[in-house]
A protein has these predicted regions:
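Aromatic-residue-lined binding/catalytic grooves and analogous aromatic/hydrophobic interfacial grooves
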Residues: 1-210
Length: 210
């Protein structure tokens, strides 16, 4: 993920940034402008419609391990570390990059992949990264065109249609998994219907618009 904050002339941009997760984790700084968050997913999460004493179960050494890195680039100004946050004060633009790895495959390579991610994230070029992203999704997005008679309601429906296509494409990039009920956009620990792959109909429905 690449985020660009643009500052207006004669204005300073002030912000603080951190990484958080509902999953058990630990975080630390790396380089001068980076934060790394590492954790391990639970082995079981009860669906939200189940009532139980321990809905989220962890087991040491089990569950998918993950690491998320965040790195800040500025051209001048001040970036400093305090507690678990990065504080930024600059009159110039700010670029924030977020990247992650897991041990979903090749568990033995997790730590080397994590270290490579921490190194590579420090050298991302925003415009190059933006172009790479646009090239990937446009290859699928531009395969179809929908034209409907203009009315305010139709315009909203058209925007929602294309927005849903964009989200679906970005959560199904080559080398990743197909979307489940919420795809990579799920932010719940106990998601509706457990954010499952319900392949009797819902997984197929995700791709009807494709």
């Amino acid at each position: 993920m690449a985020i660009h904050y643009h500052t207006s002339p004669n204005c300073n941009l002030e912000m603080s940034i951190t990484l958080e997760s509902e999953i058990k984790h630990k975080s630390a700084f790396f380089a001068e402008n980076g934060i790394i968050l590492e954790g391990q997913a639970p082995i079981y999460v009860a669906p939200p419609y189940y009532s139980c004493e321990v809905p989220v179960v962890y087991e040491e050494g089990q569950g998918i391990r993950f690491a998320i890195g965040l790195y800040v680039q500025t051209n001048g100004g001040n970036v400093y570390q305090q507690a678990d946050k990065l504080f930024i004060n600059t009159p110039n633009d700010v670029y924030i990059y977020v990247s992650g790895v897991t041990d979903f495959k090749q568990k033995e390579l997790f730590f080397s992949k994590r270290n490579c991610m921490m190194e590579n994230i420090q050298h991302i070029q925003y415009e190059k990264q933006k172009k790479a992203h646009m090239d990937v999704y446009a290859n699928y997005f531009d395969r179809m065109h929908l034209d409907i008679n203009y009315t305010p309601d139709n315009e909203l429906a058209l925007k929602m249609f294309h927005y849903a296509r964009y989200l679906m494409i970005c959560s199904s990039v080559p080398g990743s998994q197909c979307t489940n009920l919420q795809g990579i956009w799920n932010h719940h620990m106990r998601a509706p219907w457990s954010s499952n792959y319900t392949v009797n109909i819902n997984t197929e429905m995700n791709y009807w618009m494709a």
